[in-house]
Every structure is written in C-alpha cells, then in structure tokens.
Amino acid sequence: MEKTLETVPLERKKREKEQFRKLFIGGLSFETTEESLRNYYEQWGKLTDCVVMRDPASKRSRGFGFVTFSSMAEVDAAMAARPHSIDGRVVEPKRAVAREESGKPGAHVTVKKLFVGGIKEDTEEHHLRDYFEEYGKIDTIEIITDRQSGKKRGFGFVTFDDHDPVDKIVLQKYHTINGHNAEVRKALSRQEMQEVQSSRSGRGGNFGFGDSRGGGGNFGPGPGSNFRGGSDGYGSGRGFGDGYNGYGGGPGGGNFGGSPGYGGGRGGYGGGGPGYGNQGGGYGGGYDNYGGGNYGSGSYNDFGNYNQQPSNYGPMKSGNFGGSRNMGGPYGGGNYGPGGSGGSGGYGGRSRY
C-alpha cells in the first residue's frame, strides 16, 4: 500500500509505542533459551517478541536478550515485580535504549537522579512533584537558584528511590511541566561522568553499540570488559556523543559530550569550561558536582538537534542496532556475558525497523 500523509503518522505512532514496550534482559544464564525467557515474562502479559542473543557461529548464548510486551502497562508491571530470577540466576531487566541514544554519554548508566531543564520562574517544586510522581516514588526535588539574586537558573533535579522511573522518563524526549516545555536527562555526578569517560580508554572492545569498528568486547565480567571502550570507545571514535549540541545547539565549547568530554576536561556536564550547551548564557554553572561551566545556551527553547526521527529501542529484526559491518544475524554482534572475545562489530545492519 502506498504511504499517504495519513498513514505515515499512524505507522510512526505504532512504532513509537513498540519502542516503549521493549525490555533489555541482562545477566542471563547461558542455559536460558527463548522458551524459558518467554515463559518467565509471560506472567506479566503477552509478548510480541522474545530473543536470546547468540553467537552466529557457535550459537552460544551471549548472556542477554530482549522481550517486547503487547502494552506499556505490562512492562511497568514486570519492572515493578523485580528482582527477576530465571533458571536460578538473578537477571537485570532495563528499559531498552534507543539506537541513537546508545552512544551518548551515560545512556546505559543506572542512576536515580533526573536532570530537568527548561524550568521557568513560575514553576515551583510542587509542579515537578505533581508531574513526576506518577512515574515513581520521589525522594527529593531541587530547583537550582542563583545564590546572589535568588532567581531560578532554569534547571533542577528530581531523585527517585529507583532507577526505573528515570529510565522510563528519559525515553520520552519532551515533557510539558506547568505549561512549559522541559527536557530531561539522567543526572550524573562529576565522578560518575569521569568513570563513564575513562571507560573509553580501557582495554577490551566497546559496548557493542555505535561505531561498528568496536566489537571485541564484553558487556559483563571477563578480561577487558566492564563497560570498557575499545579503540572507538562507547560510541564513536571522537568521544561520547561528539557533535551533540547541548541545549539549543550552536558552536559550543564542549557541548553535551563532544571531544572535550561530558564531565571532565574543558567542557561537558561537569567540566570546567563552556559545558552543557554553547558558549555564554544558559543555565549557569558551579553547582555542586554538576557544574564548572554553563548548563546550556540562552536558546534552550530551540531544543538544539533533539527533533529527531523516532528511534528504535533495542534491536529490530529487519533493522538491527548500530554499526554497519556485522550482518551475521538479525540482532548483530557484541558480547554481554562473561569472558569471550566479543562480537565482530556492534549490532550490525544499516536499515531501520
């Protein structure tokens, strides 16, 4: 059927819903099969897809997989019932991360703290609480103000009692709070960002995402693993999310994770330079572990380059998850489990789902 202006939004809506229904399941026993994985997760609802990732040559499990539910409510029910134990092993379920997001700084880091940008002067703590408490139990809310003038800097933090609310919230790029557009991020301290950044230079291969030259690495315990980046690191060879123009875009002096770094060096989220967005203006700096630079540019409402096409959460059977070299199977390469030499270059495939 020929696509029309009416059918395209419907198809996009359907695809976006599917993206929110996918869970990544890490730490699987090598004995776990699709059947046992499906049998376990079907206690929370109907699965539309279930896969255990395997080496294309040996057919040995890589220790992780994906399940896709028929509704977002079923995903929420499954996550609310953690911990999960399959075949005698406690596994790690997480919301699947989009392909475009997977190479960005902190995309796979587990945190309970959420950064909220775009907070206006008329937005108070209770507005944030009313909006975000539907996602999970909130521990603390902070709206950052200027120490001298007392005026709001335009950003704040919401801390939950669990990481899953944060994972769920950041899947949705745009949020409207008190009538204003807001944007959310995982809030990583300077130490956490330095750990993420330093992992790029560690031994072993990369995460299996991003540049297909990575590969050769493991997602879990084993030689040269523990989220260590290879020659191209966690995303591309130019660092974490190079060219990611922060809040409002522009030339930047470090941007949101360009080559100067997302937490160290001159720029980035906790760096000592221009920082989160482009030069000048923005959300100010010098807050606790989060700032030595500015949190963004004065053109926050431009939303930088965030207006992207819908992303694919988790590998899709016809599109796959990342690089362009590994065409060895529908879900590509890379390793998750202990040991092993890793895949041959990320999640393979050029096409989209």
UniProtKB/Swiss-Prot annotation:
Domain of life of the source: Eukaryota
Nuclear targeting sequence: annotated segments: 308-347
Gene Ontology terms: biological process: miRNA transport; mRNA export from nucleus; mRNA processing; mRNA splicing, via spliceosome; negative regulation of mRNA splicing, via spliceosome; negative regulation of transcription by RNA polymerase II; primary miRNA processing; RNA transport
Modification type Omega-N-methylarginine: residues: R38, R203, R213, R228, R238, R266, R325, R350
UniProt keywords, alphabetically: Acetylation, Cytoplasm, Isopeptide bond, Methylation, mRNA processing, mRNA splicing, mRNA transport, Nucleus, Phosphoprotein, Repeat, Ribonucleoprotein, RNA-binding, Secreted, Spliceosome, Transport, Ubl conjugation
Record PTM: Sumoylated in exosomes, promoting miRNAs-binding. Asymmetric dimethylation at Arg-266 constitutes the major methylation site. According to a report, methylation affects subcellular location and promotes nuclear localization. According to another report, methylation at Arg-266 does not influence nucleocytoplasmic shuttling.
Name the record gives this protein: Heterogeneous nuclear ribonucleoproteins A2/B1
Species of origin: Mus musculus
